[in-house]
């Protein structure tokens, strides 16, 4: 089932997506007909194979995000940066080492892309446990980093089963940030 919204805009918003997996979140944005994914980064080769099937027109970069520079994104402008950095460092299913985990620095790599591209909006998703991890300090660091980069942020924990025909019962945190200069 595809839901689409007709747009009065002649130009779509450009998205650069990181930790893209198979591209499910991007698909939702594209189905609004308001957004176009101009760049995606995914390190896992099997996820990339599926991503290419779901998004054949998107430039897909398979490098480790540590090796990617903001200027590598093939677009004049990036309106939205989105990412769901790996959650094992914060998940109750993992060891919960947070920023001390080898994967825990990946938020800061996403932040590096945000700082370099200066998008008008950001969209981040992760496990709900990130909010309370390390007595809330992990989430505080993330909120402060985004706020210091001039983003007005709102966040909410949502369960996919409550929104449409999604076959999972899993709570996730969603963070939306708008560049303060873009907010009217």
Give short role names for the model-derived ranges.
Residues 1-37, 50, 145-148, 172-184:
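S-adenosyl-L-methionine-dependent DNA methyltransferase catalytic core
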Residues 41:
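The conserved SAM/SAH-binding core of class I Rossmann-like methyltransferase domains
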Residues 44-45:
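Conserved SAM/SAH-binding beta-strand->alpha-helix loop
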Residues 49-60:
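Short, conserved SAM-binding/catalytic segment
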Residues 66:
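Adenine-nucleotide cofactor-binding loop residues
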Residues 70-78, 88-184:
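Class I S-adenosyl-L-methionine
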């Amino acid at each position: 089932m595809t839901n689409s919204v007709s747009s009065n805009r002649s130009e779509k918003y450009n998205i650069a997506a990181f930790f893209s997996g198979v591209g499910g979140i991007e698909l939702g944005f594209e189905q609004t007909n308001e957004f176009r994914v101009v760049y995606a980064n995914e390190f896992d080769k099997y996820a990339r194979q599926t991503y290419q099937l779901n998004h054949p027109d998107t430039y897909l970069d398979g490098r480790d995000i540590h090796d990617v520079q903001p200027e590598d994104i093939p677009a004049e402008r990036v309106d939205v940066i989105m990412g769901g950095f790996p959650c094992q460092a914060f998940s109750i299913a993992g060891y919960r080492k947070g920023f001390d985990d080898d994967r825990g620095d990946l938020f800061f790599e996403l932040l590096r892309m945000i700082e370099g591209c200066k998008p008008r909006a950001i969209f981040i998703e992760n496990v709900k446990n990130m909010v309370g991890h390390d007595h809330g300090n992990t989430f505080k660091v993330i909120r402060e980093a985004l706020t210091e980069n001039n983003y007005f942020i709102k966040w909410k924990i949502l369960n996919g089963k409550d929104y449409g025909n999604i076959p999972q019962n899993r709570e996730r945190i969603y963070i939306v940030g708008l560049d303060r200069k873009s907010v009217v």
